[in-house]
Amino acid sequence: MLDKSLYELLEQNHAYASVLHWCGIDAFDYLDETLGDVCRIKNISTYNVAQALSELESNGTYSFAKLQRMSPAEMCNYLMQTHHHYSQRMLPVIEHHIQQTAIQHHHQYPQLLLLAKIFDSFKHDFLAHIQYENQVVFTYIKKLEKFTIQFSNVLWLALKDFSMGDFIMKHHQDDDDMFNIRKLLNNYEVSKEDHLAYKVLMHELKSFESDLKAHSLIEEDMLIPRAIKLEEKLTQRAHELIRLN
C-alpha cells in the first residue's frame, strides 16, 4: 500500500480520500506521489495512516441484532455518536471536496457551483436537526426510560412539554433532505471518463445519503416505537395515580 500512488489508491477505493483527509493528507494535492512519500513529506506516521485505511474495510457499525438488544437510552447514545461522526468528519470532508472540485473542474462540471450553495444550506439545516435530536429528543427518551424504572409525579411533570408525536411530525417533514442534491447530480451517476476528484465526490455523497437512510431506519423502526411504548406506559401510570387520588 505504501508503494502505491495516491491516484492508484483512490481509484482502488474512493473512500480512501476521506480517511486520508482525516489523517491530515489532502490526497488531490499528491496524486502522483506514493503514500509512503506523502507521509514522509507531511511528517505523518505511515503506520497510523495504513492502519486507518485498513480499518475502513471493517467499519464500526453495529449489526441489526446488536442494536435490537440495546435499551432506548443506549440506542440514543449510539445515534449521538453517529451524529458526531457526521458533523465532525463526514460533512467537513464532503464540503471541502465540493469546494476543491468546483474550483478546479467547474468548466467540466458547472453543476458543482450550484451544489456548493445547496450543500451549505443542507448542512445548516442538518446540523440544526441533529442538535434538536441530541438536546431535546434523546434527552426526553432517556428520561422516559429512567422514569419507567423509578416513577414519581414530579418527574412525570418534567415530560409534559414534549411528546413523541411532536418529534414524529417534525421527523417526517425532514425526510429525504438530500433530494435536491441527488436530483442535481443525476443520482450521483459517473462514467469512466469522469475526473477522479468528481468520482470520489459522488461516492462520498452517495455513501453519506445511504448512511443517513440507515440511520433514519434505526430511529423510525427501532427507537421511536420503543419510546412510544415507554411514553404510553408512563401516561397510563399517571392516569392511574390521578384516579386513585
Give the ranges of each region predicted by the language model.
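Small-residue-biased structural context
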Residues: 1-245
